[in-house]
């Protein structure tokens, strides 16, 4: 990643939000402080909402309490006053504070004696109605499980609104004094009041990221503010839902500990997500968010594991066992869509540290440079335990008993893949319509954000299938119509690479996006394809001769592509005729009649050649990008746009190359569909007939 510019970077640079790694540094400490403040407010809201619910429950019992509880509370107060260990719960100290506290509306609170009795008085109504006396107990458990009874005598008028105001004021006062004082709950104030499961199910904690972090910035345009607000709303909703579901699965001290751990981890991840998104690093922000969601998912899986352990104990009562079973079923349903093998993405496998499968696919070096998360020992232990639970769950989910089960799972994701393609086609349509209307300026944010997300989502599904096939390969029947695990692996790479080429073809005009996206894709594909080529099977002399001829033809093709892609030296020397010649050569190669085995070797070599070509393309693009980066801090947006236009002809040439490669893969997909009878209908339409767009 490029180094951050100084604080003196002209504000006019970011007015139109060109997402290159030259944005002004974000002060993460201020964001963390704001987030901490919101956490405190959130805790208070939870407590107030819980006690408001308790107050509402008392409404139906007011008449009974009026007649019966006065005498009981009086005798109880006398007993309490004789105990030297009892302390005033309202103040949190052992000292009585006799006197009156004046409240709004003319009400007074009198505090008398060490028993902690609070009496509330109010004016009578104007029509002369008599006052009603209401008394209520709030039980607060201390550290050593001693119980203190706080008896409150509340006198109020008939008006329900005033009664509720008095009740709420007294309860808030009591809880604040009890949890923040110097009394029995000094060491563990969070245990003073426990929010029961019923209350927390109805309370959805909202993680407010403070929209001012985004929207108060004068450097943002209105369109960018709208995009940022959408992102914040989505994150708020999803994390809110997960935290609510997670918190309702724990009781007592254990729940408090786990909740605090999760909050501490969220606080470490969140500022980086906000800072990355604000500075335009959408891919980094997306993966950082996926780590956060992965953490919450792991926590839920850990809860399931714990509950299954509880269920295995024989000394549980039948009702308790039924309750635990219901909770397990509910949790498993909630995370089913996240633990589906078709959706287990590469990002989550990286979290699990499955080195045996990911050493050759270490994309994290590309995607997380300079964004380390430092965890405390306690947080690290919690993370490791959750990762272990997650790893076991994924191992179970990815293991198929036979090939038919795997094929069934493969076809189930057909609809999902079509959804991704539909979204991409909408992006392509939008780009086509707006291309002559300042696309760079108006839709840069939209393309970069959405494009990266869906390219990554599709790639992750493909790699999940790849890992599933590798796990299941030894169980494949010999007479299967599918030509072996290696064939399927190559098919997955073919689909993945052709899809990424198609996306890059449509989005190739945006230098920052292409540089970042293709860098990650090439990192994954190059290392993986190398390992596949090393494992190619032995062949006969005739096959080897044919293979050598094919390789020679591919070398010629590669040379033509390299000459074509060398646009930064002499872009004017290439014309439409060159493009037509290139496409014809590709068609000639694809029409060669080969056996299935030779076909396999052919497109292995094709992929290798295209991989090398794309590396050369990226080297050329990187040089262009470096030239731009040197000039960005010194130029206004208008001048910057002129720089992009200077390189537009180069980028159109790149689009044409990508379009030609995409067409070739389309021809191969037709052949593979007939050979291996796999569901490829949704792919072929994307890659066939994609003529390069003209300038």
Swiss-Prot record:
Residues 59-89 have a biased composition (Basic and acidic residues). Residues 53-90, 117-137 are annotated as: Disordered. It comes from the Eukaryota. It is found in: Plastid, Chloroplast. One of its GO terms (cellular component) is chloroplast. Residues 117-129 have a biased composition (Polar residues). Keywords: Chloroplast, Plastid. The keyword Plastid applies. This is Uncharacterized 79.7 kDa protein in psaB-ycf62 intergenic region. It comes from Chlorella vulgaris (Green alga).
